[in-house]
């Protein structure tokens, strides 16, 4: 996941500064020898970018599709709706500003929302952490990001058998199907 995020950062940082990750499709089924970015959609306030990883035989080994939106309002001004968590808590973590800075340095993600005194945790940083935490070698995920997670927030991930749902307090912040 991290190598896909690193390649994604090759996208035009000036164009995508301030944009937020609304959703991700991630498919990992082996090692990729070549990665390439493809802009599938680029509009005034929404974009879709694909990172495609091919194996030595030319088959698709990894794919990441990100859905980005440019918010009309300032982030953090609307509280996420409170929802009761269902299922078993399978992972929890508090991301620090240093972890975010390390992720940004490694991937090259220069988005302004991941910097400053109270940075937003990059969505792909959370996805990569969860991939490692669950010790996954392969995955097929559709992630929907519902609300930002900030440095210092405790993120808890629950598995209800059909999906993974992440919470900060009582707010559902992302879902993985």
Where are these regions (language model features)?
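Hot-dog-fold acyl-thioester-processing enzymes
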Residues: 1-29, 71-140
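A conserved acidic, glycine/proline-rich C-terminal tail/linker
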Residues: 133-156
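HotDog/MaoC-like acyl-thioester-processing domains
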Residues: 2-3, 14-92, 149-153, 158-177
């Amino acid at each position: 996941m991290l190598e896909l995020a690193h390649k994604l950062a090759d996208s035009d940082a000036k164009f995508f500064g301030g944009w937020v990750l609304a959703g991700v499709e991630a498919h990992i089924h082996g090692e990729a020898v070549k990665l390439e970015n493809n802009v599938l959609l680029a509009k005034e306030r929404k974009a879709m970018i694909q990172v495609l990883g091919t194996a030595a035989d030319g088959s698709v080994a990894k794919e990441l599709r990100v859905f980005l939106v440019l918010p009309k309002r300032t982030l953090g001004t609307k509280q996420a709706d409170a929802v009761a968590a269902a299922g078993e808590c399978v992972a929890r973590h508090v991301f620090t500003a240093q972890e975010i800075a390390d992720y940004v340095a490694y991937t090259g993600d220069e988005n302004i929302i991941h910097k400053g005194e109270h940075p937003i945790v990059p969505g792909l940083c959370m996805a990569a952490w969860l991939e490692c935490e669950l010790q996954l070698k392969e995955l097929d995920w559709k992630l929907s990001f519902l609300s930002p997670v900030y440095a210092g927030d405790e993120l808890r991930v629950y598995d209800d058998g059909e999906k993974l749902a992440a919470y900060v307090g009582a707010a559902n912040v992302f879902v993985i199907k």
